[in-house]
Amino acid sequence: MKNTLKKLFGALAFLTLLSAPAGENLFDSAKIIPGKFGTWDAETKTVRVSIPHGTKVSNATEGVRFVPDNAKFAGKTVKFSFKIKTDDVRSIGGKNFHNAKLLLAGATKNDPYWRGSKGFTGTNDWTEVVWRLPFYGDNIRLAAVFGLQFATGTAEFKDIRAEVCDPFEAFRLKQKLPADFKCEYSPAVRNAPRLRGVVAEYYVFDDPTAFDTLEKWNVNVVRLWLGPKGANLNYKTYEAEMERQFKRLKELCPEFEKRGIKVIMTYRVPGGRYSNPQVFGTAGEISRKDNELSAFRIFQSEEWLNLFVRIWENAARTFRNEPAVWAYDLLNEPVQTAECRWNYLEVQQKAAEAIRKIDAEKPVMIASNYWGGVDTFIYLQPLPLKNIIYQFHCYLPGVYTHQGLRDKMKRIKEGNPIRYPSKVDVFGLHAAHHTVEYVDKERLRKNFQPVLDFQKKYGAIIYAGEFSVIRWAPDSDRYLDDMVS
């Protein structure tokens, strides 16, 4: 499997060498093979798959197989698009991927790989699906199957296309900035002292000794978490709960000010994510399976997005004249891997613009895509607003920083922990491109090159919102020293 991740779906640095003309439908020249339950209408260019209820089905995807010219996919990002209509599709296998969809069945050499688009069950009218995927290497064997996986019922597919595209199109803002754009900062923000601190929940400070501890640690900033735990989906009570927590933070502000500790406030996004991802997040490769289910609902739901913006407006009104609150940190670790109504940057832009109508000066922090990753700075765009700070989180390599979590401490108990520095798995953009490398201080430095390039190009201020290593990892002190040196 890891060979496929390296050779089939992977590094986007190779995506500028186009062998297919822009706009060409790569399926037009594909070999089309209808299966037992699938038909292809060449005149209307429509796929129909119908599996009667009661039919014995398996995990195989039954339908119509398209076998394109694989050479045209090599080293490209390809946008797949189609419209799907379903009639009483029932999941028989019971998994969330047992449905009607497009399945990409790929391989390099003898290493198989499957990846599915958004799937559908039940009865649905025509719905458009757009899906972008990068392909790496020149030894690709790929087939696209439009059909039903471990499911029965009827599905139709039309307007079927696959075309080479801009790999970062789905993540960009619509407006263009001047070629010589530079970020604008007030002197107070540009000349602010270097901030050093920790992340904490607001209720930690119900214990007054927490302030003493931070003073001993020489902390001058806290990235402070607010928001109701486990209530992200309760629309009716969310705003009232945030008002209560804003009031509590307001009560704490005099003590923060007295201790010389600034607050960067952030809060749990209303609506949450489509799934509850594990704790791995920025740890790259081990977060790969979370994928699109880790996207926030505000990327698709206008109702939740409006609430998200409204709460930030309330925060600006409450804290614009509060010196202890230094910045608004808008969105914690966004994850966007597919087309959305509003992409990860657009939702932050909406909130930032709303804040600026109320508070013109206090810094606003923008997070990079894919868990605040450092590599996604290669397509991050600056906002044309004053005092915008750009944030990353970094737990790389994740197999070292988060060791013991995925395997239930197996390697630790066996006395075979992952050490630093050492040769480990390293994953690239969107955790798709896999290599095995020796990771030391110089390799860590290489991780941050996209951030440095962004900083120099736009004159941006950068904030390292999170980085650390799990406490039982050997050589953790050396790792942290290298990260900050």
Question: Model-found features: residue ranges?
Answer:
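Bacterial N-terminal signal peptides that target proteins for export
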Residues: 1-9
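Active-site loop signature of alpha/beta-hydrolase-fold enzymes
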Residues: 87, 109, 125, 229-231, ...
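Extracellular and organelle-lumenal recognition/adhesion modules and their flexible linkers in secreted
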Residues: 21-183
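Surface-exposed acidic, glycine-flexible loop patches that form ligand/cofactor-binding
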Residues: 71-73, 137, 213, 317-319, ...
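Hydrophobic h-region of N-terminal signal peptides that target proteins for export
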Residues: 9-21
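Active-site mouth of glycoside hydrolases
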Residues: 177-363, 368-377, 385-387, 483
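Extracellular glycoside hydrolase catalytic/binding regions
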Residues: 197, 310-313, 317-320, 324, ...
